[in-house]
Regions:
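Acidic/His-rich, divalent-metal-binding segments that scaffold phosphate/diphosphate chemistry
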Residues: 1-64
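Short, contiguous acidic/charged loop-to-helix segments that flank catalytic cores in large enzymes
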Residues: 20-23, 63-74, 197-209
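Divalent metal-dependent catalytic cores for phosphoryl transfer on phosphate-bearing substrates
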Residues: 36-134
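Pre-Walker A (Motif I) flank of P-loop NTPase domains
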Residues: 150-156, 225-226
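Glycine-rich phosphate-binding P-loop
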Residues: 155-173
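Conserved substrate/cofactor phosphate-moiety recognition/catalytic segment
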Residues: 168-226, 263-266
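Conserved GTP-binding G-domain of TRAFAC-class P-loop NTPases and closely related GTPase folds
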Residues: 176, 259-304
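Glycine-rich phosphate-binding loop used to anchor ATP phosphates in small-molecule kinases
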Residues: 204-252, 256
């Protein structure tokens, strides 16, 4: 981490203030987990890199509530920050992907998913690498759909931040596209996207109309059992589950877009009339949870 002195300083300055982390700062916990990883699982780059990067998002998402410091969404935030660092380290793509998966999922309830070996190993390290006044054995359970056994069509749910490449991918698929952005743009063809979005956001009746149009299109494609692509951010488990519940006969696949944040930022600045605020990105980064097969996905592809 010598290449990132500013990040290390932030980790040293970020205190846990938690009964689950009485060892002190994020940096102290990171060092404890990394030391355990190198001794218990030597020459394991996935666990070593995950140990170094799993909590870097805590430096940016922490807030005080009821006298306690909370880091809600740090797993997702850490995942996106880690992409560029792993690229700087020239980490091979297969190892990079496994690290990103493990970072994103290191806070989920492992008893309810088919967790990978690295994820189970890292959970052990994460729990051992701290000083706790109260033991935390696991985390909140997740809610999944029950996949149908009789599928007639495929729904590809795209997952990623704005400007990560989802819409371009959807357009090249040649399939019907379910997109809230497209509905908003079609309502105001003479407006820029930002103008159209702000117009809709300022009027509850227009927001309701957009939702109605979205539901109508979704219902139509579900009823006709057509292959389609859902082009929205879909960063959270709940947002994906909401879509999946509307297709009774579909097989689901996910396509996850994880380009470096520098690429996303450059694309965001280069799109005339469509600039996504930083606060929106931060919110979506915090909501991000890596899709897993247990959610009901038959396959998951990654575009890094």
């Amino acid at each position: 981490m010598q290449k990132y002195p500013h990040l290390v300083d932030l980790m040293k300055q970020t205190e846990h203030n938690s009964k689950y982390h009485e060892e002190g700062s994020v940096w102290t916990h990171t060092c404890m987990v990394y030391t355990l990883a190198t001794s218990k699982y030597p020459n394991n780059p996935v666990l070593e890199l995950t140990a170094l990067l799993h909590d870097i998002g805590k430096c940016y998402v922490g807030f005080i509530e009821d006298g306690k410091t909370r880091f809600t969404g740090h797993e997702g935030y850490s995942t996106f920050l880690a992409v560029s660092i792993l690229d700087d380290f020239k980490v091979p793509q297969d190892i990079k992907l496994e690290v990103l998966k493990t970072i994103s999922l290191h806070g989920v309830n492992l008893s309810e998913i088919r967790a990978s070996v690295p994820l189970r190993q890292f959970r052990e390290l994460d729990i051992m690498g701290r000083i706790s006044a109260q033991q935390r054995d696991d985390y909140e359970p997740r809610k999944f759909i029950t996949p149908t056994t009789e599928t007639t069509h495929t729904v590809n749910i795209l997952v990623g931040l704005p400007a990560s490449g989802k819409s371009t991918f959807a357009q090249f698929s040649g399939l019907p596209i379910i997109s809230r952005d497209t509905i908003i743009k079609d309502m105001y063809p003479d407006f820029t996207y930002t103008q159209a979005f702000n117009t809709v956001q300022s009027d509850p009746a227009l927001l309701q109309l957009v939702s109605q149009k979205l539901d109508k299109l979704t219902s139509q494609l579900s009823r006709e059992q057509k292959d389609c692509v859902i082009d929205m951010t879909n960063t959270s488990l709940s947002s994906r589950r909401k879509h999946m519940n509307k297709f009774n006969k579909a097989e689901f696949k996910a396509t996850v877009f994880l380009p470096p944040m520098s690429t996303i930022e450059a694309r965001n600045l280069s799109r005339p009339g469509k600039l996504i605020p930083k606060t929106v990105y931060e919110s979506m980064m915090k909501s991000f949870v890596m899709p897993i097969s247990d959610e009901g996905f038959a396959s998951i592809d990654y575009i890094l």
